[in-house]
Amino acid sequence: MSEYRQATDAFASNPVESKQEIRNYTMNFGPQHPAAHGVLRLILEMDGETVVRADPHIGLLHRGTEKLAESKPFNQSVPYMDRLDYVSMMCNEHAYVRAIESLMGIEAPERAQYIRTMFDEITRIKNHLMWVGSNALDLGAMAVMLYAFREREELMDVYEAVSGARMHAAYYRPGGVYRDLPDRMPKYKESRWHKGGALTKLNAAREGSMLDFLENFTDTFPSRVDEYETLLTENRIWKQRTVDVGIISPDLARAWGMTGPMLRGSGIEWDLRKKQPYAKYDAVDFDVPVGTNGDCYDRYLVRVAEMRESNRIIKQCVKWLKANPGPVMVTNFKVAPPSREGMKDDMEALIHHFKLFSEGYCVPAGETYCAVEAPKGEFGCYLMSDGANKPFRVHLRAPGFAHLSSMDAVVRGYLLADVVAMIGTYDLVFGEVDR
């Protein structure tokens, strides 16, 4: 008798003993998945299509930013901050330069504070435009990305006009900002894509200064947000994919240290711009949107409302900046570099500039923690100085790290398709998570 026949007879005589164990299966989500938003590797334990456990793996974008910052003079590490959350660049810079200013006991001029406030909100709109477009794309609504990037491109031009870079601006400096706002905006040149009446229309808002351009932008932007909401807010498929998906209770949000839209979407009104004002947030009028249910849909509504509030803040800052010219850097020349004009005919100014940017300056011994309300949540910088020209310790508090830690607790019991919606609503960028 063959071995096959023997095994068949054994199973027929006692099927209970031959019963095989049925186990959950493990699935790798990312790091190459297009909805992973970077290098997220999520190991999912699945029972059919239901998530039983989620294990996020991080570190694939670790670059040792904190240790790099500790090896360089204080003022040389500002560009590193841009490369953490590389969608919210200037907000990262703001936390770092505030920490240096706190240790040195200096304060940026009032005009520089208004410029920082304005660019923090420009950055918030840029972040949320990227988020609403990419999150909608993840869930199958491609058109929203095209609409959102139309306005985001205009704000990228503002970044480029003021700093020379579309993304990594390095515009904030300890003691102020790199330079005052430019008197003109760059214009589109004729090309195969821009020509004729369309080119004239595009350049119509770029005839004046940057503040004129931003004033025009703030007038038109609310109607653009209305267009995004027309596409999504009452869209039946969008609501089916987001309502009652990824519910985070207020207690769970507090327990996991959530901040920003993740916390406010659960109904907790916590915003550093209101609770611990910095820059000129105590001088502008705005509201803090909060959700009620704590699901993906509420977090979407919170971010859309935040874009409208950021637009209000920018409009107020533009009005003040137009009426109040002034310095944008402190007069403490231990921190402030000489002017470009001065360096052209003054050797002492050239030496001063060289020493300032090659050796930096010594910061009094001490420690401080400064945080800003970044688009994704509380971005904080703990800075310790031993009196040298380099930090003794730099620690960065990234909101995405705390949010990602809660992934397992939030996604359990949902379907695999819902995981994509939840990852999108977390608004993760792994430059800040891995650091």
UniProtKB/Swiss-Prot annotation:
Task: Tell me which EC number(s) this protein carries.
Answer: 7.1.1.-
The enzyme's first-digit EC class, named in words, is translocase
Q: Tell me what reaction this enzyme catalyses.
A: a quinone + NADH + 5 H(+)(in) = a quinol + NAD(+) + 4 H(+)(out)
Q: Which InterPro entries does the protein's record reference? A: NADH_Q_OxRdtase_suD, NADH_UbQ_OxRdtase_49kDa_CS, NDH1_su_D/H, NiFe-Hase_large
* Source organism, top-level taxon: Bacteria
Q: Name one GO cellular component term.
A: plasma membrane
Fetch the HAMAP family from UniProt: NDH1_NuoD
Q: What does this protein do?
A: NDH-1 shuttles electrons from NADH, via FMN and iron-sulfur (Fe-S) centers, to quinones in the respiratory chain. The immediate electron acceptor for the enzyme in this species is believed to be ubiquinone. Couples the redox reaction to proton translocation (for every two electrons transferred, four hydrogen ions are translocated across the cytoplasmic membrane), and thus conserves the redox energy in a proton gradient.
Q: What is this protein called?
A: NADH-quinone oxidoreductase subunit D
Q: From which source organism is this entry? A: Xanthomonas campestris pv. campestris (strain ATCC 33913 / DSM 3586 / NCPPB 528 / LMG 568 / P 25)
Q: What is the lineage of its organism?
A: Bacteria, Pseudomonadati, Pseudomonadota, Gammaproteobacteria, Lysobacterales
- State which gene encodes it: nuoD
